[in-house]
């Protein structure tokens, strides 16, 4: 087929069709530079050359009753990770100060839970109020499934975003988790939206999806209107059901980059984040990825290490990207 129309305003008005998306995902190697430049143009049209730095904090590690196949903290996991109860208020504030020193613009508080308990809501509510009083950080919570009133409590405490990833396509979800459904995740995002929280929701690629499922994920997130969209690439962790790496065998740097391009083109106004696994899978294309996304995670993920801060800084400085600063509104 002919090249699709990749004009940024047009992409904001009308999503790519499945046929156009497959053109991107199945493009030959010689088309990759032009597709990458198109994605970069989209990012710069809507956001300029800004890059937002995001820091994660795992406020409670392990002991999660859910059975997500990718997760080292789940009930099915035998992974050798640190497991600890809910951090104290003082520990959370120390890590917020560290995030500020690293030039982070957003601080994400994550807990391995089916959903937040009253204790978790109280502790993180206190933490949010204290952080907002001291640091110009955007705050995001990722605490599992939300019941009635929980999102409102988080919003009142000062959280700006709620993270709850769709992770994969609806048709594949029963392979990934059985203790909750894809629809449960959609309900949680709906509750967060109705409470006035901005939505952070993304995917984990490399869990057995094909090109059509990648399109399905990207389109679903567009239809949800998520403000923040992390694209993760599976890090197989020994001791988890997906720990043998069989599902990522074909995830080459070219395929990883083309997937990121598609998420950019289908979600031109979303804050796209190159998340877990970028260091491993993007390889020589990581500089291109930095130019087409809005944000990156700093210094690692929930249970896995990431890039040293100095390495990432050298990369964004070499590309002339402007790191976001300033008080959050």
UniProtKB/Swiss-Prot annotation:
Keyword set, alphabetical order: 2Fe-2S, 4Fe-4S, Biotin biosynthesis, Iron, Iron-sulfur, Metal-binding, S-adenosyl-L-methionine, Transferase
GO molecular function: 2 iron, 2 sulfur cluster binding; 4 iron, 4 sulfur cluster binding; biotin synthase activity; iron ion binding
Binding site for [2Fe-2S] cluster: 108, 140, 200, 273
Gene Ontology biological process terms from the UniProt entry: biotin biosynthetic process
Enzyme class: transferase
Database matches in CDD domains: Radical_SAM
Any Pfam family: BATS
Cofactor: [4Fe-4S] cluster; [2Fe-2S] cluster
Catalytic activity field: (4R,5S)-dethiobiotin + (sulfur carrier)-SH + 2 reduced [2Fe-2S]-[ferredoxin] + 2 S-adenosyl-L-methionine = (sulfur carrier)-H + biotin + 2 5'-deoxyadenosine + 2 L-methionine + 2 oxidized [2Fe-2S]-[ferredoxin]
Record text on cofactor binding: Binds 1 [4Fe-4S] cluster. The cluster is coordinated with 3 cysteines and an exchangeable S-adenosyl-L-methionine. Binds 1 [2Fe-2S] cluster. The cluster is coordinated with 3 cysteines and 1 arginine.
Residues annotated to bind [4Fe-4S] cluster: 64, 68, 71
Documented EC number(s): 2.8.1.6
Matching HAMAP family: BioB
Entry protein name: Biotin synthase
